[in-house]
Amino acid sequence: TDGNKEPTDFSVTLENGFKNFTDLQLKVFFRSSGRDNLITRKYEASPYINMPKGYGYEIQYMNMSGKKYKFMMNLMRRKGEEYASALGWNKAYDFMVEYTPTDSISYSIFYQDLKEKDWLNWLENNLLGTYEKRQRLTVGGINWFKGDKHELRLKAQMVAFTARSPQAYLANNIGDLIQADIALPPITLSDLAFQIRYRYEIKPLSYFYLVYTKGGRVVQYDEEDNLGEIYQRPWDDPETDT
């Protein structure tokens, strides 16, 4: 049996620029059915999983040339990706806004919300699970400069990942998934990375740095879906997994 049957993929990108410096891009792709020979970590009894064909589109609209405002918006609906297979459909949107009122300060915010049906997750050996997956990501930042001497940067990244409605499967030796009567818990993951960094130039190529960082990851097996609560968990107790 050939466990290295690679799918073929094809994509087309159309792009149009406007006089107001905005840019519109449409991308479509197709990926043939094939085998994922990585997901089971080379487990001998089930070395690969058969994956269906994939296809979808992505629309992007942006203006990254504005003097005070820059923005980007994306909308996606796809089954898998151009270079990665998936069992179910996913849809996502994201946006980014950057505001620079003066040359000395800028603010930015990025947000993404992704939902995927039948997200396939390897658990151990030939045991896998499918879930209703949702991932929300927020990234914010502030950059401030005063002349060539002072620089202050603040950045925060927060991830809220949930996997609901779990269903267990056992993979056989020809890549098929057989539904199994095994109880799997839901998953709620919170991830935080936060940093404030101040830099002072003592003299050319000689700097003083003052840095504060906070981060952590919390995994719990519950069904909390409130975004604020999930984001708050690693702030309160960044090393707690249950």
What function would you assign to each model-found segment?
Residues 1-242:
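Exposed, low-structure sequence patches enriched in small/polar residues
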